[in-house]
């Protein structure tokens, strides 16, 4: 299949990335049809830097209020679908994702091998050495919980934000079910499972710049934990009660009742 004529859109959520956004935009491959940059109410010169880039493919969306990475992406995704994109790639504006690796994400979708592709830094053992130990441990824990919540047991590194999705699956997603914060990627996986989407991991190096992260770790850890637990229960309910009812459903009911009685009278 000739993928050179496919309509590819790249969505870039941009928040306080004045030092890197121009380089990121300059590195996007020429075969990309549309570049949609969402300035999520940056407090620095991000918007001015975006406007300084002369590229007719660029569409700038400016949020007056910060909507979070998920909110920014949903704005960009909607715009990409409106432009008739076949595949939509999500690329961060902090220069931690190599645009040259984009074909590795796009080709499996165009060739019918996957509906959604994502980077996996754990499949790149040499570059993985640059990942801080705290990130490794946190990512392993997050991966395990995400496997339970989403049902994608073959997927690793769920927080990796370098992704691509087919227009068909993107249009089928319910945006109301997608998180607006840094739980965005994980919530995408959970919702894609409901659509029986094929998800594929793509080896990708871990790149870390000297940019200061805007993530508040204690707050985001609490949000991730509670959101994952909620998604786990949502998956159990959807799979064993809403869409089907099997012997496992009965076991879950009986087991829950026994635990309840044991907790009260045990």
Regions found by a protein language model. Give the residues of each.
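Acidic helix N-cap motif at the loop->helix transition within catalytic regions
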Residues: 19-23, 44-53
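A conserved acidic beta->alpha catalytic loop
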Residues: 39-48, 95
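Acceptor/aglycone-binding surface of glycosyltransferases and processive sugar-polymer synthases
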Residues: 63-82, 87-89, 99-182, 209-219
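Short beta-strand/loop segment that forms part of the nucleotide-sugar
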Residues: 33-42, 61-62, 91
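Cell-envelope/extracellular polymer assembly enzymes that use nucleotide-activated donors
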Residues: 7-9, 34, 187
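Conserved beta-strand segments of alpha/beta enzyme cores
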Residues: 34, 57-59, 154, 198-200
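Short, well-formed alpha-helical segments that are part of the catalytic scaffolds
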Residues: 15-30
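Hydrophobic helical membrane-anchoring modules
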Residues: 1-4, 177-266
């Amino acid at each position: 299949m000739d993928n050179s004529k496919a309509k590819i859109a790249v969505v870039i959520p941009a928040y306080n990335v004045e030092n890197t956004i121009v380089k990121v935009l300059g590195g996007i491959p020429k075969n990309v049809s549309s570049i949609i940059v969402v300035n999520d109410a940056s407090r620095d010169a991000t918007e001015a830097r975006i406007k300084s880039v002369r590229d007719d493919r660029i569409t700038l969306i400016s949020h007056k209020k910060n909507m979070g990475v998920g909110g920014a992406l949903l704005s960009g995704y909607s715009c990409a679908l409106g432009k008739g994109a076949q595949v939509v790639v999500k690329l961060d504006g902090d220069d931690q994702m190599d645009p040259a690796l984009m074909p590795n994400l796009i080709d499996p979708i165009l060739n019918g091998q996957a509906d959604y592709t994502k980077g996996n830094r754990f499949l790149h053992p040499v570059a993985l050495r640059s990942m801080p130990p705290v990130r490794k441990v946190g990512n392993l824990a997050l991966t395990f919980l995400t496997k339970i919540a989403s049902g994608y047991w073959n997927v690793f590194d769920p927080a990796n934000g370098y992704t691509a999705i087919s227009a068909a699956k993107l249009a089928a997603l319910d945006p109301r079910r997608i998180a607006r914060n840094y739980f965005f990627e994980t919530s995408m996986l959970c919702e894609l499972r409901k659509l029986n989407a094929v998800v594929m991991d793509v080896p990708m190096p871990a790149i870390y710049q000297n940019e200061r992260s805007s993530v508040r770790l204690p707050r985001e850890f609490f949000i991730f934990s509670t959101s994952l637990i909620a998604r786990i229960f949502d998956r159990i309910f959807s799979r064993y009660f809403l869409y089907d009812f099997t012997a496992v459903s009965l076991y879950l009911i009986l087991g829950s009742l026994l635990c309840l009685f044991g907790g009260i009278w045990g």
